[in-house]
Amino acid sequence: MCDRRHSRDETATSAGESFAGRLISGLGSARHECSDLSDGVVANERGKMSTTMERAETKDQTIEHFDVVIVGAGISGIGTAYHLQSQNPGRSFVMLEAQDSFGGTWRTHRYPGIRSDSDLYTFGYRFKPWTSAPIATAAEIQKYLSDVIAENDLQRHIRYGHHIDSASWSSDDNQWTVNATRADTGETVTVSANFLWMCQGYYRHAEGYTPQWPGMERFEGTIVHPQTWPEDLDYRDKEVIVIGSGATAATLVPAIAEDASHVTILQRSPTYYFTGENRNLLADHLRELDVPEEWVHDIVRRENLFNLRVLTQLALEEPEFAKEALIDLVRAALPPGFDVATHFTPRYMPWRQRIAFLPDGDLFKSISAGQASIVTDEIETFTEHGVRLKSGDELDADLIVTATGFNLSVLGDISFSIDGVPLDLADTVTYRGMMFSGVPNLVWVFGYFRASWTLRVDLVSDFVNRMLSHMDELGAQRVTPQLRPQDLDEKWLEWVDVEYFNPNYLMRSMHLMPKRLDKPEWRHTQDYWAERDELPLVDLDEGCLVFE
């Protein structure tokens, strides 16, 4: 065993990243300067990894062994599989997906109007050009992912209908044993791997978050959460209340407003919105010049990232100015005299939560046309025919939609253990927002809150593939993040600084998350631009990572 120690260290404005240039221009952000934006293992002898899947016979079944198990076949898992296959082509891997097909969110969420809240030039992969409108429907994203799978022969690695129940690490064997239940037969399937790559996302797909308000059982109509929207739900000519005003509500309301009798948005407090055309003028111009799509994708991606960086800096450095500019944009999109102060002026500063992007101002058009209205108040109780508010007003409804967020899922709610000891991630410290102190050979892909989630899929993949190659060079069979002597006296902090980002779903579940230190090695910085430059240069032999 090698005893050396080694370390080295892609919601709505996010949706409007493609359009950030328009907002930046309105905010006078040309003052801000930004830097250029470029964008399974079985040791068969010391330091060598098997390049084929192996089988281990047990008394009850055959256990397949892979170099890597990738958990999830959504946008994170598919991107991870592409990079693993491209950068480490000799490694065997399998993708275990609980659903009956690929796509993750873009398959399980089926409410009307579902679309991205980030532009696809940055939400898409760096290696696969996006060729359509920046804000995409779920069907368009599914087609994009399908093309990536087909073009890179990834289908043969995916096993659908495998719900993972537990994962246990053995230091004696230097491998993970993963137990999954097959959806079609109910049988337990066991696979082993030296490396576990968690790409299952960060919320529970089976259920959304719905607060328990008084009197809900009295309501005689239908209550539904967007995350579990029934395919046969009929909202035509119905009075609809949508509780919530985040990206989901902003997407859903204009999609149903034309057919419903009326839609009322009921919010406890306002959120920020940004609106613009669902097109990218630079991309259109480049295509008119017959510029190859690979170039168009790269150029527009860089432009959008540059604009987003300037917007983020402005919101953090001059929050009052950014707030007024955003509210002025909303005021211009609504009828004269609309009560913007009550309904569209948040209590918090921009970027403390994601900013919802409204392509072509669709929500504001529904409000202006009288198809939708907005009420800012709190619920006192549900009634037989709707809700009574704390102001005393009552809202009637046939259908109530609780667009109230989701439930955070830490590592897919899987039961983990290390050498027989149950693992509680709240007792660990995150290593660069992707690994955990004391947990060997495991990576969690957790994207960005303010930028496109998938940007980090690319960056983490580059880092982990470099780390795997480094393990080969050292003859190491495991890598474990470990606090250095100079880290031991540091204060353990909550996973994210709530002063700068505090969405409700995260606040409800912060106690389940790993901790952080006030050091870049031991936190998720949530800074794409810093990580883009720093992660490729991280010294793997620095001491935070122990290779054995």
List the model feature ranges, each with a label:
Residues 62-65, 70, 79-80, 86-92, ...:
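Rossmann-like dinucleotide-binding core of oxidoreductases
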Residues 63-158, 267-268, 333-338:
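Beta1-alpha1 glycine-rich phosphate/pyrophosphate-binding loop at the start
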Residues 71, 191-203, 241, 396-405:
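Short hydrophobic core segments
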Residues 129-147, 314-318, 350-362:
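Short beta-strand to alpha-helix junction loop
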Residues 134-202:
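Feature captures the FAD/FMN-dependent oxidoreductase FAD-binding
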Residues 222, 226-228, 385-388, 407-444:
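FAD-site-proximal beta/loop scaffold in flavoenzymes
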Residues 272-275, 429-430, 441-548:
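C-terminal, flexible cofactor-proximal segment of oxidoreductases
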Residues 328, 332-384, 395-410, 493-548:
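C-terminal catalytic lobe of FAD-dependent flavoproteins
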